[in-house]
Amino acid sequence: MSKKDTEHDDDFALFKDAVQGVKKLRQDTIIQQPKKNTKQKEITRSNREASDSEFYFSDEFVPLLNADGPTRYARDDVSTYEVKRLRRGVYVPDVFLDMHGMTQQEAKRELGAMIAYCVKNEIHCACVQHGIGKHILKQKAPLWLAQHPDVMAFHQAPLEFGGDGALLVLLSIPEK
């Protein structure tokens, strides 16, 4: 044996004698929380928000909308000045939803998800592009939007945001 090996053995024996009779401490003060699966919870929460928002849209209920002129709607507590500002394009949409090629069910779900997203991120103006096509979504989108409690007003979009094939939506953001 070399000199290093004997020193190592002596050190190890000395350490073993020093810690003889020592017991492992039991962790009793800090509780380790199990790691949560945050990604899965985020997915389920966003799906729940979308389905909750979709709850407001009924195909049986038909709100009274102005039939002549461009498509427009305003709640009773919204001034006509706000609708005029929507028409003129003063409000610039931060979110665009393109519903071209969607079924009614898909469009309804995406519309609910868009409104939930806007409320969550405090976005006041959005653009819904329903297209012209066979006029199915063009007729349904205003009816669905008029039923949602977070929609203050909507108006046919100016040409730069889609014209006849789009709506500008003004949303109310609840105070936190």
UniProtKB/Swiss-Prot annotation:
Entry keyword Hydrolase: yes
InterPro entries: Smr_dom (IPR002625), Smr_dom_sf (IPR036063), SmrB-like (IPR022990)
Keywords of this entry: Endonuclease, Hydrolase, Nuclease, RNA-binding, rRNA-binding
SMART domains noted in UniProt: SMR (SM00463)
Pfam families: Smr (PF01713)
TM annotation in the entry: none
Entry-linked PROSITE patterns: SMR (PS50828)
Ranges for domain Smr: 97-172
One MF term in the entry's GO annotations: rRNA binding
Cytoplasm listed as a keyword: no
E.C. number(s) listed in UniProt: 3.1.-.-
Gene3D superfamilies in UniProt: 3.30.1370.110
Gene Ontology BP terms: rescue of stalled ribosome
Subunit structure: Associates with collided ribosomes, but not with correctly translating polysomes.
Protein task: Acts as a ribosome collision sensor. Detects stalled/collided disomes (pairs of ribosomes where the leading ribosome is stalled and a second ribosome has collided with it) and endonucleolytically cleaves mRNA at the 5' boundary of the stalled ribosome. Stalled/collided disomes form a new interface (primarily via the 30S subunits) that binds SmrB. Cleaved mRNA becomes available for tmRNA ligation, leading to ribosomal subunit dissociation and rescue of stalled ribosomes.
Family from the record: Belongs to the SmrB family.
Stored NCBIfam families: PRK04946.1
Protein name: Ribosome rescue factor SmrB
Species per Swiss-Prot/TrEMBL record: Vibrio campbellii (strain ATCC BAA-1116)
Gene: smrB
